[in-house]
A protein has these predicted regions:
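H-loop/switch region of ABC-family ATPase nucleotide-binding domains
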Residues: 184-186
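ABC ATPase nucleotide-binding domain signature region
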Residues: 50-91
Length: 236
């Protein structure tokens, strides 16, 4: 059963079309990736799903009871500790959000190593954290909020290779516990390796793929990066 469906979605900035007849389905417990170059419209697509922007035409069917959205722009107050920013996020939905203790127990169950890194970052002030630390902390905090629809806009951007591994571990753990996840990335290999299916957003269209092998075959490419480049520049 689909948790989220987009049907023939179109969007334009004034008279400039950005998306044409976009269709996407996300089932419960499914992990779907969105690939696309800068400016292709990945963030706009997520904004449409979250009702931040309105489509020019088409339909969005969203049956999620609780959804969260990690945006690209994160500006936590620099004098707060990261744990305090986590409390602010959690308290935005205080009636149903898990307690901090419950979140930490869940994270330790996912990965003791990830729990340790998260705990270390939580004690630092925002001003002393790198961009990657801030982004990874926000991503993990949102994943721990027990939402049924999780939308992550480039969660691994600016994050080191080790923490990228742990973020994907957490994403997969949340999915295995019932969450449906939409995630965008510039890293073609990590999308192909971790997602059940993925889409390529290019030239105003959303193209579906079941595997990395399929996109390579369709674009006669010898690598995922080559396939990404060819798909980005391909025109109907």
């Amino acid at each position: 059963m689909n948790l989220l469906s987009l049907m023939d979605l179109c969007f334009s900035y004034k008279d400039m079309p950005l998306m044409k007849e976009v269709t996407l389905n996300l089932k419960r417990g499914e992990l779907i990736g969105i690939l696309g170059s800068n400016g292709a419209g990945k963030t706009t697509l997520f904004d449409l799903i979250c009702n931040i922007k309105k489509p020019s035409s088409g339909h969005i069917f969203n049956s999620a009871k609780r959804q969260i959205y990690l945006t690209q722009i994160l500006t936590p107050p620099p004098l707060l500790r990261m744990s305090e920013t986590g409390d602010l996020i959690r308290n935005l939905d205080s009636s149903t959000a898990p307690t901090q203790s419950e979140m930490l127990i869940r994270l330790e169950r996912w990965s003791p190593s990830l729990y340790k890194r998260y705990s270390l970052i939580s004690q630092k002030k925002v001003a002393r954290c790198s961009y990657g630390e801030i982004r990874s902390y926000f991503t993990l905090t949102l994943l721990l909020l027990e939402s049924d629809l999780i939308i992550l806009d480039e969660p691994t951007a600016g994050v080191d290779a080790e923490f990228r591994h742990y973020i994907w571990l957490a994403i997969n753990s949340a999915r295995q516990e019932g969450a449906s996840v939409l995630v965008s990335s510039h890293y073609t290999e990590e999308i192909a390796a971790n997602c059940d299916r993925f889409y390529m957003l290019a030239n105003q269209r959303l193209e579906a793929f079941d595997s990395g092998g399929e996109i390579m075959s369709r674009y006669n490419a010898s690598s995922l990066d080559e396939a990404f480049i060819k798909a980005s520049s391909h025109e109907d």
